[in-house]
Amino acid sequence: HSADRSRALKVTPYYTRVTDYVDALRCPASLGGACATQTPGGGKFVYLQFANQAARLYGIDVSGKAPLASTRVGEFGLEGLVGYTNGRNLDTGDNLYNIMPLNAKLMLTHRHGGWDNVLEVAMAAAKDDVSAERNEVETAGYALANLRASYSWPKVRIDLGVENLFDTFYSLPLGGAYLGQGTTMTSTPVGSVPTWGTAVPGMGRSIYAGVRVTF
């Protein structure tokens, strides 16, 4: 970081090996599973059993900030975060379950008097390094705009904001499978079994306001 800490860059790489990582294996048909452990089971939910296996995770987190301009209407700055994780089951060679894909946040900040405002763009790449063993659902990449503003007095702060400003439809990379997509969600009866392959959608446009008082 710079001497006045107005500029900063932090890079954190990591590498981890786990000898008894709690993962999962397909249940064999003899135990009541939907299919034998060696069959793909594509397009279906699968029966699983916990298993301790060797795993490897590595990744990197990068964060930084820098001032952009100092004007009569306030101080403008730029802040950013980037994260990447890769996880693999060393016993099966499969991708680890529920690993966040490459993601980033870019924030344009503005401060003037009691005002503290942020325009944020939150992004995630497509999740296609999924666990085949669990038949994990893939998700598409997305970019969301969020707008936040606050005004502070010595003991009171007012917060206002809009999350997902443009009401973008997206699926949560770590949301799992949507189990509501069955007979109650479609005009065509599909029995009592939910449809596989529908990811849990993210929240639409959300507007909030709040007041914080310090005693």
Model regions and ranges:
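A generic beta-sheet turn/junction motif
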Residues: S2-D4, H110-G114, Y151-K155, F215
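Short, glycine/charged-rich beta-strand-loop motifs at protein surfaces that mediate ligand recognition
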Residues: D4, T12, E133-E138, A145-A149, ...
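Exposed loop/turn and edge beta-strand positions of beta-sandwich/beta-sheet ligand-binding modules
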Residues: R5, Y58, G74, L102, ...
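Gram-negative outer-membrane beta-barrel transporters
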Residues: A8-V18, A34-A132, G210-T214
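C-terminal beta-signal and adjacent terminal beta-strands/loops
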Residues: R17-T19, A24, A125-D128, S150-F215
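Extracellular/periplasm-exposed beta-strand and loop segments of Gram-negative cell-envelope proteins
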Residues: V22-L31, Q38, K44-A55, G93-Y97, ...
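Feature captures outer-membrane beta-barrel proteins of Gram-negative bacteria and organelles
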Residues: P101-H112, A143-A149, Q181-G182
